[in-house]
Amino acid sequence: MTISPQYIWNQVLDRLKLRLNPTAYETWIASATVQTFQDNCLVIQVENPFILNHLQKTYYSLILEEVETIVGYPIAVKLTTSQEQNLRIVDKNKDNLSSTKLQNKRQQESPKLNQLNPRYNFSRFVVGPTNRMAHAASLAVAESPGREFNPLFLCGGVGLGKTHLMQAIAYYRLELYPNANVFYVSTEQFTNDLITSIRQDSMENFREHYRTADILLVDDIQFIEGKEYTQEEFFHTFNTLHEAGKQVVIASDRPPKRIPSLQDRLVSRFSMGLIADIQVPDLETRMAILQKKAEYENIRLPRDVIEYIATNYTSNIRELEGALIRAVTYISISGLSMTVENIAPVLNPPMEQITASPEIIIQIVAENFNVSVEDLKGSSRRREISLARQIGMYLMRQHTDLSLPRIGEEFGGKDHTTVLYSCDKISKLQKKDWDLSQQLSELSDRINIASRNQN
């Protein structure tokens, strides 16, 4: 007798309901539905990526245990989202799609689009008084690159939306023109590419790559300070693109004139277009950001909770959204209802980043990735160890004042170029990988807590 997928899942739900507190069950499990049971694999669909991420981290082993108990033998369980399911349905019926839909599908599969964070688009950017000009200028550049505001210089503190707007410009153009040469890079990536081309005697390839861009977007240009040869090469790249009517967009945490050791001619070039300043969002904008974030992640938030978080987290958007995730996670784990009284203990006061010891950082990263401290300090190239080591280097750069060579020493005598590569890689990955970004935020919180307790 063949057991139906629905029967299996109904039995699993009944067992999970007994093992979990009611709030956790209703929040994370109840809405999940069974899709198929083929080739010893049960496919379970959930509503959104946020729930998917939490289930995989927190409840996957429990679900697998109960499924195997019902079935009676080892099988695989795959968790998926409704968005992924819809994409598969579209693919199966592609012969019936209009030419417009086929074109959109091809655009979504563009390799350049895949390098961007799909959450960083114009529709998800909340406009307020402190970022209105930057948003309007970015949209104008996306619609008609090279005509107005060239270059566009986005200026603002950490976590205020500069990267969001830059990637939104790239996303907008690539959706319309998948084959356009739209390059979004960090200043460190530009520098690393330059160093590699010098070592490999391939400067012509480097120049051809960057100087044939239709739109060049360079993030964190403040890190060009003190790099004379990088400034020289970027100056000529800028001139070539600008003279050809191509668009250049630059982002920095400070205006051009305040970037130390920046060549005067670059200050002049960066200032010849529009410098759009982004300030800390006001209370109403912060509340709107939280509301939109909750809607996209399918989270129900009482208005007083939104107002409480928005009132207490004022520095930047990244901190604001991190507080929301902490509150939702705490409520789901504790089984409490979502009220100001229940979330206040974990959110108030806001977690401030403090200087941590290298030992604390390495220990927390090792525990998180289930590897040993010796693994992190060793030379193993196993994927899970290598990634954990790179994340450890990135976090050490964020939470300490150590130089790159000193960080390398803490990880078993690694070269400073290895540390730079690792930090740049994780910095770029977190901008397009929401799960990694949240993981880094959680690790930072643990590092801060451990450091505060040590002090």
Swiss-Prot record:
Pfam families: Bac_DnaA, Bac_DnaA_C, DnaA_N. CDD domains: AAA (cd00009), Bac_DnaA_C (cd06571). Residues 115-331 are annotated as: Domain III, AAA+ region. SMART domains: AAA, Bac_DnaA_C. Domain I is involved in oligomerization and binding regulators, domain II is flexibile and of varying length in different bacteria, domain III forms the AAA+ region, while domain IV binds dsDNA. Belongs to the DnaA family. Plays an essential role in the initiation and regulation of chromosomal replication. ATP-DnaA binds to the origin of replication (oriC) to initiate formation of the DNA replication initiation complex once per cell cycle. Binds the DnaA box (a 9 base pair repeat at the origin) and separates the double-stranded (ds)DNA. Forms a right-handed helical filament on oriC DNA; dsDNA binds to the exterior of the filament while single-stranded (ss)DNA is stabiized in the filament's interior. Oligomerizes as a right-handed, spiral filament on DNA at oriC. This is Chromosomal replication initiator protein DnaA. The gene is dnaA.
